[in-house]
């Protein structure tokens, strides 16, 4: 299987077991793994978790409550800053050899459940290593797989643990069916694609609509050796956006952000570049009932009315829809609307260039994108902006630089993936709340009392759908109508190509590809060329 060389190490999650595991079909459900059982307060202010006495690391040593407490403190001191922010004031203590107690500074169901997914790492190994340190040998682990071979930046091989302690637990039945899994790292996606067609690896998830429509051809496809599998994704959808860094003066005015959005001709791009494969993003809860796809209901208005003076008027009177064009490549109406917005914001046209009416400074910004990314849309977007007198400079950097600049918010605009949420969760704090303004998840740099107030209510309403429904829709309206990010697209289907040597369960999971439930099919493999079996 392929991955980008600069990506996080593939499948590291299979090295460590978690206290509980979630279901790929049931959002919000947790089943015991390292944990044997749990008792907790009705308000989720504390929990005591009993560790399964059978749980073992790969060296045979038992998993203890001390390992759980150690892992939490390791993440608090060496993990990402967001973890420390979320769990500030939380205590995790071993109160018995196989019992750990978690206490939150205040009741919070979402934060407690997130800790139920904590991977358990062995104190015996990690007390002598930092999470940021490069390792010359694989770490001691405890999950269904261990690393058995690797070459830095080229490949890593995972082998199934034959005496894995949890192999027969109900949560693992039918899972982890491959003896060996190898991941190869590629710098260039085109090279990776050709390698896949030639049989260098077995499975490819395709994110390019053009590739899917035009390049999956040749003898191996014609003979049925490679199978193209496309099926509709019915779950909450990941969506693509362009984040405006609203901390930069150029994008501090909502009218400028809306004008830039009007210049993004999705309809033409989708027809000319993407073979009609994408749908336009229009919500941060895409494909869920929490998306604000109707006029505000009375319960939403009750939430929004006290903050009316701080909100765009459209929040109360219109349903958010991104601007649409006729797809011919020159949308005069949208460009005229954009021009008017720029004029109103104090950016006037002078010698075919937008300049600040007071300072004479030209309206220009930099789009930061990853080298080798799908960037067909960039030049048409740049051309449309030029028609408005706006200059968009393009800066391509490698993934390491992109990550560093994202973390330091050193960009004007950058593409971002908004990860799907099946319901409005406490995780929204990290992405939008003022208390997390330094979080790299808050790509636009939003600091809004209105957003803070809604998210605080969302956190307090966890588990109460009657309250979450109007809160989620109200937040969706506030975020979209403020144009903190420019909505790009999403792909409503999963597209996977594979060499035909695998079988899959008849019922697919809703929220993932379910690769951990696939298995090697000897009969199918026998029909392939000998070197590809």
Predicted feature descriptions by range:
Residues 50, 84-127, 135, 144-151, ...:
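Surface-exposed binding/hinge segments that line
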